[in-house]
């Protein structure tokens, strides 16, 4: 009976994991893009923007069409800092490309990771402009620049990239400000009204993107790709691409922020504090989706000047950086963009501990080993109770076999006799299940820490393990993990039933195959945990045997 329950528990644990991964996948946007040829984008009709006259408190989005290719008169302005290399088009003043210099495309490809792009898939572009009743540089504006390349100089902490637009006496200076050691970009519009009439308008910032093409991430990684909105009332909420298809969002909020999320990276739009902004979404042609925000109206009298500034964070979900940006701009909970699933409450302290250890040892693999040891120490007494119960079960196996043979034709009498034996020997038949029950939530939480934390992306361990976030290329760790499970089986009480015995013999091989697909960091944790468990179980088994002979 006890082995049946143990087998059932293990089976339920495996099924629970599979169901959890399936459930997580269902929570993500299921739609896959059907991408047309990019040249056809130019001819797409734009959805009409809603009327501004009815709601003058916040500007409405400039949501026309999709991203047009540069015309022949447009220039690409190249910008380089210590962390990013970007291209800004003079057509609309969009950030059309942005490479992350400290993050590789792949572990075996040193090319910088391209987060923003207007060529290839997925399309992801940052746009900013002005809208209003009078002249304003919107999506189709043509800006002038004094130079084609800007680079952050040694000893300088900021780099300004000005773009100039002028029409009918209204001059707009659009300035991108980049910073050293930062992925934060300020977007400032300076309006100089030399016209005879007063000028009124609003600033908008928006992100356009397509879903990732099918097959770009492994099946075991179901990280959310789509929009999100943070408000003081509802806190953090996701906006999937299917939500954008169903209805347009138009929501006024004070001191919020909006982000376009993907695995490991994101773009966040952060308004100035203390003002009410309108957040909006649009589903556009060519499987393109838009998430943006627009400011309250800016009034500039004739002969006067005014300006409006907002912020863009475009980079990796590095939690220290997100925390620093939040502190600098007085923004709440940017770290919520790092999604560890329903066990976030457990995953966050696990990541914190892992990060603190890595700061000391400077190796994420070693940090996983130390964290596993600390977890084992924390649950040492609980595990000891279970292992003592299993050791006692092992000791009474001959008596249990006699009971089974004596009452082979009367299952009720057999179970009653077994329970009396457990009571006499002070054995809890389910005691051996506790280590598994304890490890399941830790396992799931650590799984998401390893696959969702960009800090571990392409993080090397040693020897052949050069990326803890991807699977072992030679399957050595999964094979060692399977071998450790076989050793554990030898220490456990053997099942009496031959069918149960065969099932238990097969389980290590099933788990080995399963773990061949998991990140190497997770297998490293499980292998280390198994080795420590074997050592503890062997030690307790020897203690029980000595106490019996004393």
Swiss-Prot record:
Pfam family membership, one: YidC_periplas
Entry keywords, A to Z: Cell inner membrane, Cell membrane, Chaperone, Membrane, Protein transport, Transmembrane, Transmembrane helix, Transport
GO molecular function, one term: membrane insertase activity
Any one GO CC term of the record: plasma membrane
GO biological-process terms attached to the record: protein insertion into membrane; protein transport
Residue ranges of the TM segments: 6-26, 341-361, 365-385, 431-451, 473-493, 506-526
Lipid bilayer topology: Multi-pass membrane protein
Residue ranges of the region described as Disordered: 31-74
Comp. bias regions, Acidic residues: 34-46
Subcellular location: Cell inner membrane
UniProt cross-references to InterPro entries, sorted A to Z: Membr_insert_YidC, Membr_insert_YidC_N, YidC/ALB3/OXA1/COX18, YidC/Oxa/ALB_C, YidC_ALB_C, YidC_periplasmic_sf
Purpose: Required for the insertion and/or proper folding and/or complex formation of integral membrane proteins into the membrane. Involved in integration of membrane proteins that insert both dependently and independently of the Sec translocase complex, as well as at least some lipoproteins. Aids folding of multispanning membrane proteins.
Protein family: Belongs to the OXA1/ALB3/YidC family. Type 1 subfamily.
Subunit structure: Interacts with the Sec translocase complex via SecD. Specifically interacts with transmembrane segments of nascent integral membrane proteins during membrane integration.
UniProt name for this protein: Membrane protein insertase YidC
Species per Swiss-Prot/TrEMBL record: Halorhodospira halophila (strain DSM 244 / SL1)
Protein encoded by which gene: yidC
């Amino acid at each position: 009976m006890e082995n049946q329950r143990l087998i059932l528990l293990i089976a339920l644990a495996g099924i629970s994991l599979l169901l959890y991964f399936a459930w997580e996948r269902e929570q993500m946007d299921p739609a896959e893009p059907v991408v047309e040829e990019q040249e056809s984008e130019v001819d797409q009709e734009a959805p009409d923007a809603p009327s501004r006259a009815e709601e003058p408190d916040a500007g409405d989005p400039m949501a026309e069409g999709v991203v047009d290719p540069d015309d022949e008169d447009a220039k690409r302005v190249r910008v380089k800092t210590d962390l990013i290399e970007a291209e800004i088009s003079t057509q609309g003043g969009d950030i059309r490309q942005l490479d992350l210099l400290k993050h590789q495309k792949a572990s075996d490809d040193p090319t910088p990771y391209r987060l923003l792009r207007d060529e290839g898939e997925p399309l992801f572009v940052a746009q900013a402009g002005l809208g209003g009743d009078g002249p304003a540089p919107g999506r189709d504006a043509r800006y002038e620049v004094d130079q084609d390349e800007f680079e952050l100089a040694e000893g300088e902490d900021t780099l300004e990239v000005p773009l100039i637009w002028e029409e009918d006496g209204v001059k707009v200076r659009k300035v991108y400000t980049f910073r050293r050691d930062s992925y934060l970009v300020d977007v400032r519009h300076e309006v100089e009204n030399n016209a005879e009439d007063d000028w009124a308008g609003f600033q908008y910032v928006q992100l356009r993107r397509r879903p990732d093409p099918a097959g770009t991430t492994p099946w075991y990684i179901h990280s959310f790709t789509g929009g999100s909105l943070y408000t003081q009332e509802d806190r953090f909420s996701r906006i999937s691409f299917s939500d954008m298809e169903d209805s347009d969002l138009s929501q006024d909020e004070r001191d919020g922020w909006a982000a376009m999320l993907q695995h490991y990276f994101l773009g966040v739009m952060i308004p100035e504090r203390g003002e009410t902004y309108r957040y909006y979404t649009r589903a556009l042609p060519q499987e393109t989706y838009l998430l943006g925000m627009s400011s309250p109206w800016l009034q500039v009298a004739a002969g006067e000047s005014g300006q409006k500034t907002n912020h863009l964070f475009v980079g990796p979900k590095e939690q220290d950086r997100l925390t620093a940006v939040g502190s600098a701009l007085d923004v709440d909970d940017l770290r919520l963009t790092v999604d560890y699933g329903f066990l976030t409450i457990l995953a966050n302290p696990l990541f914190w501990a892992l990060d603190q250890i890595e700061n000391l040892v400077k190796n994420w693999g070693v940090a996983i080993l130390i964290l596993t040891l600390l977890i084992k120490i924390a649950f040492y007494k609980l595990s000891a109770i279970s292992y003592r119960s299993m050791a006692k079960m092992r000791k009474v196996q001959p008596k249990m076999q006699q009971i089974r043979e004596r009452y082979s034709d009367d299952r009720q009498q057999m179970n009653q006799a077994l329970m009396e034996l457990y009571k006499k020997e002070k054995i809890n038949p389910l005691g051996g299940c506790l280590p598994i029950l304890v490890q399941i939530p830790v396992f799931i939480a650590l799984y998401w820490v390893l696959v969702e934390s960009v800090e571990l992306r392409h993080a090397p361990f040693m020897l052949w393990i050069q990326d803890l976030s991807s699977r072992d290329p030679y399957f050595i760790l999964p094979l060692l993990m399977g071998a450790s499970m076989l050793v554990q089986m030898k220490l456990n009480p053997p099942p009496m039933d031959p069918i149960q015995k065969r099932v238990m013999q097969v389980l290590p091989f099933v788990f080995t195959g399963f773990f061949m697909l998991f990140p190497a960091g997770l297998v490293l944790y499980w292998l280390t945990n198994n080795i420590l468990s074997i050592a503890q179980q062997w030690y307790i088994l020897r203690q029980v045997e000595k106490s019996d002979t004393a």
